[in-house]
Amino acid sequence: FDKARGPGGRIVSKRTPYAGVDLGTQYFTARDGEFRAAVDDWREAGVLASWPVTPRVLPEGQPARAQARLVAVPRMSALARHLAEGLDVRCGVQVREITREASAWSIQDRHGDSLGTFDGVLLTAPAPQAQSLLAEPSPRLAARAVEAPMKPCWAVGLVLDEPLNLAFDAGFPSSGPLG
């Protein structure tokens, strides 16, 4: 179940009349061997490509650490759609409650209607949202979710009339309120 209009969570993309904009994850890296194997499969499927950009650390302008950065094509949300193929993913559904009943999990939507019973539950929501869903079935996990550190990432999507004349395509602020 995904409360958004489509699958993806943090790899969300938005379409505007002018361009598609990745507002969640702008790119990702793959260092773990098993994950790299999955990435290779996604590349072969045509879902991923290398991001040919070397971000700069700002304001110094030095190149960021060299590493392979990957993007989904044509937008980041394409990876979520690819992973969801063949699955029963229900979008636009907000889960309100998860309860344990005997050997199964019962899930209700925001209106209190049953979404069914399941053998297992996997939560990918940010910790503050997961905390409220975990409060009844696992107070211990709910308490851990409250303590989980959150590291926000700001993304700005701009569509300009003319390209900016900058010496870099992407930047990582190293000081100030965003650094």
Across the structure, where does each feature detected by a protein language model lie?
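Glycine-rich nucleotide phosphate-binding loop and flanking beta-alpha elements
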Residues: 35, 97, 128-131
